[in-house]
Amino acid sequence: MAVQQRRVSKSRKGMRRSHDHLTVSNTVACNECGKALLPHRACRDCKTYRSIKLSIK
């Protein structure tokens, strides 16, 4: 197993981890029922996409 050569400072550790955060996904309201959903996706509740009724079997 590898052994570190030098101790990693708090600053360097923080800089390394600066990109590890989670991002919040955008949500939009459905045009028909108003439920929150991801953009460019059909609504699972009312089966519509851009006010067009989908026939899902």
Curated annotation (Swiss-Prot):
Biased composition (Basic residues): 7-19
Region called Disordered, residue ranges: 1-20
Keywords: Ribonucleoprotein, Ribosomal protein
A GO molecular function held by the record: structural constituent of ribosome
Transmembrane domains' residue ranges: none
Domain of life: Bacteria
Keyword Ribosomal protein attributed: yes
SUPFAM superfamilies referenced in this protein's UniProt entry, alphabetically: Zn-binding ribosomal proteins (SSF57829)
A biological process term (GO) from this entry: translation
Any one Pfam family match given in the protein's UniProt record, by short name: Ribosomal_L32p
A cellular-component GO term for this protein: large ribosomal subunit
Family designation: Belongs to the bacterial ribosomal protein bL32 family.
HAMAP family: Ribosomal_bL32
Matching PANTHER family: 50S RIBOSOMAL PROTEIN L32 (PTHR35534), LARGE RIBOSOMAL SUBUNIT PROTEIN BL32 (PTHR35534:SF1)
Protein name: Large ribosomal subunit protein bL32
Species of origin: Ureaplasma urealyticum serovar 10 (strain ATCC 33699 / Western)
